[in-house]
């Protein structure tokens, strides 16, 4: 099988694996001859050794030869372990034991103070940003390099790899180990290698990641692939500010987005004073204390398609009798795109500004319809303050209100499938509330729940230009084909980016399937019930 059936590992070197398998086979076979040469070999406890003794009747020379071959094979195996992927036999346990216990996809601040919190921008004391050299990697990242089993599970689930891009998450982890091997003498001398680890990774790999964390979820020994790429982005974005020619077409649109975030606190570059215009006729509190603050996010504030989702969410909350408000023009971007793009300084500036607004208004409960805002506000802002603020996704609140009887029992028309957003399902751990909120799902996609396939917008990819080679589909098209194959009438989504990407993907393949947010489905049913009465 190792020699002939290699679809998953096509193109990978066979030599190392074959040598190891040969050694294991040698150790196993020679052990039977060693047993056969023992006095009084037991057929009960050593049946194969006893069978060899009775059948082959080994000579003394054969036993001695087998014993030497046995010991040499073991010695060779032990010698090769540190130089091969089989170092995982030693390093897998500490890798699992010391794995990051924080919520998945929670990125590390630029600098932590003695209290464990992020150091404020004005107090930062750093000589460099991000990862450019092997010596910039944390000890946990280094262990990952030696713990990898080369099983390729991460490769198999990576959306960038599936769409033919340069990124292979398994090779990124291999690069960490190979870099150490190649620069061993320099590192042991306590010096910094001249080789740039960013060049080893490849900028086309670094910028292809959607940060969906499917690779992390698939890894049996808790290797964390994504931070190595996002830390490299930090260095490229905050220190070098120059990019390889082969990624310029991909990254340049992102640079315009960063400028928009800096000037207008939204990626579209639209005037910030228009941020709350979508709710002008909804009779909702604006920048006033309320039990629930709906954090619309940039997409729902400025994108016409997603404004409807925001309006329906507010309508649902008011239908349930909740005290709800919005921040209006005082709301700023959560900073997710800036952080995933590598501009950590901008992210921290946006986070500190939003937290100051939350404190001024007295925000205690936030509802977000964007999983990226849900994750960033609820998980990552805690390093900067606001630990007592509860953040929930709108599907969680809707389902809670349905259970309490404040909203009608959930239902939907026609057959419905559901696409799990990465930052809500796999990363956020919320799989049931979205499904329950719409009255269940009639047919699931092939890859669903924590194994769901990315829509292609995460990791700031929404603001980059995706390029694929002939013979490959874009990430959103791959996912849209899976969704269309369910035969459902409607695909429910819980993310504005997923809505955009899947709508485009379905259009590209000529599918007429409808794409609806959870809030849209729920509000349609509420209006239908009211009309029936």
Residue ranges and their predicted role:
Residues 158, 219, 502:
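Cysteine-centered loop/knuckle micro-motif
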Residues 399-415:
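Acyltransferase donor/substrate-recognition loop-hinge adjacent to the catalytic core
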């Amino acid at each position: 099988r190792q020699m002939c059936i290699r679809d998953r590992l096509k193109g990978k070197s066979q030599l190392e694996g074959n040598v190891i398998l040969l050694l294991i086979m040698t150790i196993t076979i020679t052990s039977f001859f060693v047993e056969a040469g023992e006095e009084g070999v037991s057929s009960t406890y050593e049946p194969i050794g006893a069978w060899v003794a009775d059948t082959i009747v080994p000579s003394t020379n054969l036993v001695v030869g087998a014993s030497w071959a046995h010991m040499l094979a073991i010695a060779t195996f032990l010698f090769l372990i540190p130089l091969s992927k089989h170092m995982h036999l030693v390093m897998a346990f500490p890798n699992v034991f010391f794995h990051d216990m924080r919520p998945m996809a929670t990125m590390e601040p630029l600098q932590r103070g003695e209290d464990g919190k992020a150091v404020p921008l004005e107090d930062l004391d750093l000589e460099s940003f991000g990862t450019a050299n092997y010596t910039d990697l944390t000890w946990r990242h280094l262990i990952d390099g030696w713990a990898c089993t080369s099983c390729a599970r991460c490769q198999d689930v990576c959306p960038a790899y599936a769409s033919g891009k340069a990124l292979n998450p398994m090779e990124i982890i291999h690069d960490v180990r190979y870099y150490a091997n190649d620069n061993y003498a320099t590192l042991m001398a306590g010096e910094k290698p001249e080789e740039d680890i960013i060049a080893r990774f490849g900028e086309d790999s670094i910028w292809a990641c959607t940060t969906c964390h499917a690779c992390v979820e698939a890894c049996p020994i808790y290797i964390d692939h994504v931070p190595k790429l996002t830390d490299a982005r930090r260095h490229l974005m905050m220190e070098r500010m120059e990019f390889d020619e082969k990624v310029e077409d991909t990254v340049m649109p992102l640079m315009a987005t960063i400028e928009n975030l800096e000037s207008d606190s939204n990626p579209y570059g639209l005037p910030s004073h228009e941020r709350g215009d979508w709710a002008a006729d909804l009779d909702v509190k604006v920048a006033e204390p309320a039990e629930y603050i709906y954090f619309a996010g940039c997409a729902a504030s400025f994108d016409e398609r997603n404004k409807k989702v925001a309006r329906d969410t507010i309508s649902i909350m008011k239908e349930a009798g909740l005290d709800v408000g919005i921040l209006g023009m005082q709301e700023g971007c959560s900073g997710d795109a800036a952080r995933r793009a590598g501009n950590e300084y901008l992210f921290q500036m946006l986070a500190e500004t939003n937290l100051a607004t939350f404190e001024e208004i007295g925000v205690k409960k936030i509802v977000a319809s964007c999983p990226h805002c849900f994750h960033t506000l609820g998980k990552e802002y805690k390093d900067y303050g606001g630990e007592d603020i509860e953040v929930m996704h709108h599907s969680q609140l809707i389902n809670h209100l349905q259970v309490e009887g404040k909203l009608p029992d959930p239902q939907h028309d026609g057959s419905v499938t559901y696409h799990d957003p990465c930052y809500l399902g796999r990363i956020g751990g919320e799989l049931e509330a979205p499904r329950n909120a719409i009255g269940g799902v009639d047919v699931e996609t092939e890859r669903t729940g924590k194994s769901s396939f990315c829509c292609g917008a995460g990791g700031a990819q929404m603001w980059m230009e995706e390029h694929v080679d002939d013979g490959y589909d874009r990430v959103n098209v791959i996912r849209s084909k899976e969704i269309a194959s369910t035969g459902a009438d409607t695909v429910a989504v819980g993310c504005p980016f997923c809505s955009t990407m899947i709508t485009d993907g379905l259009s590209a393949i000529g599918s007429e399937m409808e794409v609806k947010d959870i809030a849209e489905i729920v509000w349609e049913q509420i209006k239908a019930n009211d009309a029936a009465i």
